[in-house]
Amino acid sequence: GFNLRIVKWAKKFSFNNHYYISPQVWAWKESRVKILKECLNNLYVILPFEKKYFNEKHSLNVEYVGHPLVEHLLKLKKDTHFIEKYNLDGEKEIITLMPGSRKQEIKKILPIFIDVVNKFKSYQFVIAAAPSIESEFYLSIVKNNSIKIIHNNTYNLLIHSKAALVTSGTATLETALLKIPQLVCYKTSFVSFFIAKRLVKLNYISLVNLILNKEVVKELIQKNCNAKKITEELKELLMRKNKSILKEYELLFKKIGNNKASKITSKLIINSIK
């Protein structure tokens, strides 16, 4: 990507190169590691397993600094007027729908979520809209359903939620750090999935499961990502007290719970150039 091109350019002019937040070469395009090895002085990673990957497998100078999400979420204040502000039903618990950040995946996932909504009349479902996607796009899929759409307030929406249906990505980690039980749901075209399976060598798609190296949150992928299966798993999730999931979330927080990732990184860079 763009950052790697900048790194290569800077190396030509003998600049010290420090890279904060590694490209996910451990997931795909591992060949990019060669550029990192040739051009970087130090790499600062935000996921605990990345240090071992880069250090032991590829002999890079690596520092694990914690995840910057933590610093942001610890500063978050609960909006006590959230329900009234968005005209939500104070008598019904909320289930958040996070169908992705790209139109193509939303078109694939959201109709499945809508089929699930109809099975849970005693709950209210709210879409956490991607910032770059207009409400009209969601409404074209939701149509006359009672699902509400909220922009630019995902964290407060999650805080007020009983559970969430989440498409894979950073959203799974955000949901876990806010201690909300979740199901991870993902579906793409057969061709895209076939190609991805050949390129991506991971046991899980959720960052929560990747970091803890076990299935803490249920992953419903491809043929398992259907209304029937999601309904079954969501019913079970809502019936449980979720103590086991919350306990695992605590472990997750301990693993990445450094709330000074950016400060630590800046200090390490400054110390290296003194």
Please give the residue ranges for each predicted region:
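Nucleotide-activated sugar donor-binding and catalytic core shared by glycosyltransferases
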Residues: 1-274
